């Protein structure tokens, strides 16, 4: 059934498999985890896919769903703790970097 929404999880590399799912007619979002650089690459990839696809395929690229595999309490504690941002790999750092990126896209 084509009404399935694909969450395309890739944590270690920004694999471009969203294109495969869109070509098959599925709506798809890429789902990064705790690596900010990979997550930002996935945002750029999704924008590129939308801009360089025909309208039929472009509509299937739904965006990004950030994955957090911790409880809300521990995530929020990390998010508001300044020492968290010294880490290169972190759920909280990834969310913060994605929010910064999204703010640059608002006027597009």
Where are these regions (language model features)?
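Substrate-binding groove of N-acetylhexosamine-processing glycoside hydrolases
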Residues: 1-108
